[in-house]
């Protein structure tokens, strides 16, 4: 069975500040690069946006996806926190509204539509896919900050 391999990264210059996200998708010999930029955003918003944009371009729901991110916020959120947030009406353990709720809700829908296995990868560790996603995010930020 073929798998789609996805690497995502998000970054921010200032927090909040100018942010960018990058995605590198691989499926067999095919690869696709995506990137985007946003003003007045946060690093966590860009990390979430990268994963959302990656999953939005996948049209088939029956292909396994390995998604790699260096964001522990995204990994822990999607694999642990989100179940409790939903059970508590999108509130945290402290009964406060979940930050970035719009992004988390969109990611939750996409995650449930696809067969995603989530992987954490250490950032800036020489991982080719993570380095590519990071470079795409930085190129996006370069476009707006120059």
From Swiss-Prot:
Question: Cellular component per GO?
Answer: cytoplasm
List the keywords (alphabetical): Cytoplasm, Endonuclease, Hydrolase, Magnesium, Metal-binding, Nuclease
In the UniProt record, does the keyword Chloroplast occur?
no
* Class in the EC hierarchy, top level: hydrolase
| Ranges of residues in domain RNase H type-1 | 1-142
Q: Which residues are noted in the entry as Mg(2+) 1-binding?
A: 9, 47, 70
Q: Where in the cell is it found?
A: Cytoplasm
Q: What is this protein called?
A: Ribonuclease H
Recorded name of the encoding gene: rnhA
From what superkingdom does this record's organism come?
Bacteria
């Amino acid at each position: 069975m073929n798998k789609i391999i996805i690497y995502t990264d998000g970054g921010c210059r200032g927090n909040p500040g100018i942010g960018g996200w990058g995605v590198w998708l691989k499926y067999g010999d095919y690869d696709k690069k995506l990137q985007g930029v946003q003003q007045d955003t946060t690093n966590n918003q860009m990390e979430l946006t990268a994963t959302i944009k990656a999953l939005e371009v996948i049209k088939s729901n029956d292909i396994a996806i390995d998604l790699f991110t260096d964001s522990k916020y995204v990994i822990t959120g999607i694999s642990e926190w989100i179940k409790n947030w939903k059970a508590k009406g999108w509130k945290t353990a402290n009964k406060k509204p979940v930050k970035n709720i719009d992004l988390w809700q969109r990611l939750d829908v996409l995650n449930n539509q696809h067969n995603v296995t989530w992987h954490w990868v250490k950032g800036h560790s020489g991982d080719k896919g993570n380095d590519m996603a990071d470079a795409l995010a930085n190129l996006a930020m370069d476009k707006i900050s120059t």
